[in-house]
Amino acid sequence: MVEEHRDVIYVTSNYVPGYRAVEVLGFVYGLTVRSRRLGGQIDRFKSILGGEIKEYVTMMEHSRQEALERMLDHARELGANAVISVRFDSDSISDIMQEILAYGTAVIVEPEE
């Protein structure tokens, strides 16, 4: 599936269907770090019982979107109009912080003829 954010196309595949890459500009990424403290004891209690922590899910969705937007801004700075091989990664920095990374390869694409 091809997505477009303002003027930059992004895909998880190694190419954009219907386009050809005419220049590879390099690695781009967007990073955000968020605190996981969301009510302390209530969240611990929910996790013991196995329930979903909706506040945490919402925070992670917003973090993922922010990392994606930062990656696309990085691509724009390089002059790209597309990012291929887009991936996300997540890691805990400590007991209270979560890191979200969006990354891919910035390219210039043109429609195939």
Curated annotation (Swiss-Prot):
Highest rank taxon of the organism: Archaea
Matching HAMAP family: UPF0145 (MF_00338)
Name of this chain's protein: UPF0145 protein MTH_544
Alphabetized InterPro entries for the sequence: UPF0145_dom_sf, UPF0145_YbjQ-like
Family: Belongs to the UPF0145 family.
PANTHER family per record: UPF0145 PROTEIN SCO3412, UPF0145 PROTEIN YBJQ
Lineage of origin: Archaea, Methanobacteriati, Methanobacteriota, Methanomada group, Methanobacteria
Taxonomic source organism: Methanothermobacter thermautotrophicus (strain ATCC 29096 / DSM 1053 / JCM 10044 / NBRC 100330 / Delta H) (Methanobacterium thermoautotrophicum)
